[in-house]
Amino acid sequence: MDTFSIVFYKTLSGEKPAKVFLNELSHKQRAKTIRDLKILELCGNRLREPHSKYLEDGIYELRTKQGSNISRILYFFFVDRRIVLTNGFIKKSMKTPKNAIELAVRYKNDYIERYI
């Protein structure tokens, strides 16, 4: 079984928003999120709830829970079995914040424009 490769979206200024988010997590939350990223890398587009959920416009969320802390990293699939991590947030409400999804869609469109 071929694995997928995970890459971080990089803005024109060189920032990697999902990586910044990951580094800001507590040690335990980061470790659990990295474990979930490895599962995503192995399963790719076959990964489903409770680990991953399709949101809209080609954007998915990786769902990680550590105690009462719930984090999400948004991502999309790209050619050559690539998973592009766009941004992340700590979940504080039942619904995924619309602005987080809109940001992920903007990053996705920018990535596609620059790499196709």
PLM feature spans:
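Basic, Lys/Arg-enriched alpha-helical interface segments
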Residues: 1-70, 79-83, 92-116
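Compact, Lys/Arg-rich rRNA/RNP-binding cores from ribosome-related proteins
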Residues: 89
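Portal/gating segments that form or line small-molecule/metal binding sites
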Residues: 73
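Conserved catalytic cores of phosphodiester-cleaving nucleases, focusing on short active-site segments
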Residues: 86
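Conserved Hanks-type protein kinase catalytic core
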Residues: 76
